[in-house]
Amino acid sequence: MPHNSDVRKNKLAKIQLDEDPRQTGIKISWQGEVKTFDSYKIPLQYLIYNKYNGRIGTLVSSHETQYSELDPENKNDANQIENFLWESKKDRNNATLSSIASEGQKLHGIVTIDGKIIDGNRRAMLLNKITSNPDKYPTTTHGHCEYFEAIILDSPGTEKELLKLETFYQMGQDEKLDYNPIEKYLKCKTLKQNDFSNNNISKLMNEKEPQILKWLETMEHMDSYL
């Protein structure tokens, strides 16, 4: 079961003090400037999923409308989020699962100071799937699959700052897996509701501004029918 926020925050701070980084000198744009970070190996139990991740945002929103709010700190709810992540790209997930099991995590993620995953939900889900089913994989994989390598942000950040970072790394750079149209519409709407301009949204999502306008109009039409 995932730990609470204070426990996670204390553990991540201790990791940065006591452990050697896996990578150094990683530059990311955070809070209006380019900052340099290191990445660390973090035990999976000290992380929680970002339930409104662009890849599964509509599934989570639909579930919460029909049933109840999902709490990533709750084991059953975390399992539901994992299921959404798995089903979102099942074929590709199977292929990546085999790769991670044999070779380990290749790309670092990004997490908040209390362990919320900003970039890397899917990779963390696959690592959790491997560690929760150890008999299916060679024992040589067990050690490296118990940890998620990630940058740990240096401050909590505002909701808007985290949304900006999340969007850039999930939808502006993530060419590994395409997002479905509805996820893009919803992300545009969320950014607009958080006072991002159309120009800012286009840059974050690596799309031309007329496309952003089209998606926002589509989302508005969809909302009018609900």
Question: What is each residue range found by the language model?
Answer:
Residues 84-85, 132, 141-224:
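Amphipathic, charge-rich alpha-helical segments that serve as recognition/docking helices
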